């Protein structure tokens, strides 16, 4: 039966030394989503490896994590979660945050983009910004082997926001993070191989 709304997934394991992105690049224009990650060692992958071999972002394709649910903190730096019912933690609480924030209205600017308006003070801790006119969802991920304390480096001019009226909060996300509020200049603790979802907004 013809199903016009059906999605085509491309699934693969690591491909050993070949890597699935190298092996299947020719198929990318014809699929909707990548489901790479069987046997991926997410906690050992460097940021560039995440970006090129897993995320699909350089090729304009979305992705989902697989092996053991991936790393749900670092995955958010690439706007990806595990597939529902694969892994210990449900991605639904993060999806709910996406929905309440209105992520479909945001422009994604990752650490790999020279115009990303949010950076961190530590090169091992990456930030991706999902930018709306009145608020920004920030995903921060610590790729290092140790806990880090970082502060955010924010390009207020490119955001068109008044720093004196800005608020920085970590919303509660079930099984992901507790609610917190940070001052704009304070150091934010990020555990090794984990991260935070933050919302930068203007006080009303």
Indicate residue ranges for each PLM-predicted region.
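Active-site-proximal substrate-binding groove within the catalytic cores of carbohydrate-active enzymes
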Residues: 1-162, 170, 194
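Polar low-complexity intrinsically disordered regions
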Residues: 163-167, 203-204
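Solvent-exposed beta-strand/loop surfaces of large extracellular or lumenal domains
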Residues: 165-186
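C-terminal beta-strand-rich structural cap/linker in extracellular carbohydrate-active enzymes
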Residues: 179-204
């Amino acid at each position: 039966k013809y199903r016009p709304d059906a999605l085509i997934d491309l699934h693969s394991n690591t491909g050993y030394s070949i890597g699935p992105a190298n092996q299947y690049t020719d198929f990318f224009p014809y699929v909707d989503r990548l489901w790479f990650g069987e046997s991926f060692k997410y906690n050992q992958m460097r940021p560039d490896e995440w970006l090129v071999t897993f995320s699909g972002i350089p090729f304009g394709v979305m992705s989902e994590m697989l092996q053991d649910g991936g790393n749900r903190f670092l995955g958010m730096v690439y706007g990806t979660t595990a597939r529902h019912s694969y892994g210990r933690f449900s991605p639904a609480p993060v999806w709910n945050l996406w929905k309440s924030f209105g992520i479909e209205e945001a422009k994604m600017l990752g650490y790999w983009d020279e115009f990303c308006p949010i950076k961190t003070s530590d090169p091992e801790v990456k930030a991706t910004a999902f930018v709306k006119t009145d608020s920004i969802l920030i995903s921060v991920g610590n790729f290092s082997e140790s806990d880090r304390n970082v502060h955010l480096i924010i390009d207020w001019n490119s955001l068109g926001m008044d720093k004196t009226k800005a608020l920085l909060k970590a919303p509660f996300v079930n099984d992901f993070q507790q609610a917190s509020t940070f001052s704009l200049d304070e150091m934010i603790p990020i555990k090794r191989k984990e991260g935070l979802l933050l919302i930068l907004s203007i006080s009303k």
